[in-house]
C-alpha cells in the first residue's frame, strides 16, 4: 500500500471509528479500512494470476494522499507496484475504460516512465480532468463525447489504444474495468452495449503477455453482473 499512498493517508483511513464522509462522494465506516485492504489484495491476486478482481470499494480516483470519488486506495496502482516489486515485471500498462477519468491512477504514475496509463472516458465529466491535450509520454487520455457508443469506442481502441500499448510493449496489462459507460448506467451518458464491453475485453486480452482486470465503476446493479460476465467472456477468448 505504501508504494502508492502516504503513511498519513493510510493511517487516516485506518483510524475511522464511525460512519463519516471523507469527501462529498466517499462515505466510510469503521469497516471501510478492512474492505479497502481486501480490495487492494484482490487486485494483487488478479495481477499474479491473470484474473478479474471483483473489488469494492473501487480505486482509480484515490490520490496518494487522500480518498476521492468512492475510492479509498488505488487498487490497480497497488497491483502495478506489486507486480514490479514482487513479480519482477518492469513495464506495466494500465487501461482504464471506466466512464470517469482515472485521475488518481494518472497522478500516481505521472512521472514514472515504466508505467503507461491510458484512459477512455466521458468528457467533460467528473472529476474534471483528462481533457483534450492532457497527458505526457506515458499518460494518454482519450476524452469522448457524451452519447458515445460501441462504434466510437472501437474507433479509438483500434486507432489509439492498441497502437500506444503495442509501442510501449508492457509485460503486464492491468485493466481498470468500469462498466458505467453502459447504455443503462444511471450515472453517465454513454451508450456502450454488452457486446461493446465483450469486444474491448477480447481486444485487451491480446495486448500483453499477461492481462488482469480490476472492477471500477458500474452503478446499475441489475446489469452489472451481466456486464462483468460479458467482459470475462471477452478476456477468455
Regions found by a protein language model. Give the residues of each.
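HDAC/HDAC-like amidohydrolase catalytic core signature
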Residues: 1-237
Amino acid at each position: 500500500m505504501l508504494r502508492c499512498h502516504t503513511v498519513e493517508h493510510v493511517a487516516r483511513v485506518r483510524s475511522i471509528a464511525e460512519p463519516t464522509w471523507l469527501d462529498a462522494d466517499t462515505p466510510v465506516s469503521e469497516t471501510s479500512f478492512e474492505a479497502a485492504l481486501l480490495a487492494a489484495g484482490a487486485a494483487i491476486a488478479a495481477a499474479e494470476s491473470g484474473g478479474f478482481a471483483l473489488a469494492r470499494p473501487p480505486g482509480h480516483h484515490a490520490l496518494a494522499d487522500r480518498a476521492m470519488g468512492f475510492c479509498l486506495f488505488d487498487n490497480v496502482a497497488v497491483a502495478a507496484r506489486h507486480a514490479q516489486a514482487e513479480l519482477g515485471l518492469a513495464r506495466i500498462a494500465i487501461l482504464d475504460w471506466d466512464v470517469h477519468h482515472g485521475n488518481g491512477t494518472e497522478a500516481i504514475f505521472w512521472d514514472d516512465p515504466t508505467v503507461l496509463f491510458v484512459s477512455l472516458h466521458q468528457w467533460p465529466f467528473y472529476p474534471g480532468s483528462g481533457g483534450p491535450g492532457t497527458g505526457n509520454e506515458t499518460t494518454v487520455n482519450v476524452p469522448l463525447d457524451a452519447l458515445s457508443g460501441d462504434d466510437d469506442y472501437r474507433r479509438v481502441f483500434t486507432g489509439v489504444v492498441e497502437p500506444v500499448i503495442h509501442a510501449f510493449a508492457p509485460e503486464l496489462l492491468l485493466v481498470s474495468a468500469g462498466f458505467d459507460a453502459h447504455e443503462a448506467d444511471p450515472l453517465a451518458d454513454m451508450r456502450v452495449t454488452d457486446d461493446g464491453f465483450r469486444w474491448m475485453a477480447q481486444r485487451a486480452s491480446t495486448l500483453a503477455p499477461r492481462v488482469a482486470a480490476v472492477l471500477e465503476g458500474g452503478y446499475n446493479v441489475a446489469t452489472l453482473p451481466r456486464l462483468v460476465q460479458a467482459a470475462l467472456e471477452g478476456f477468455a477468448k
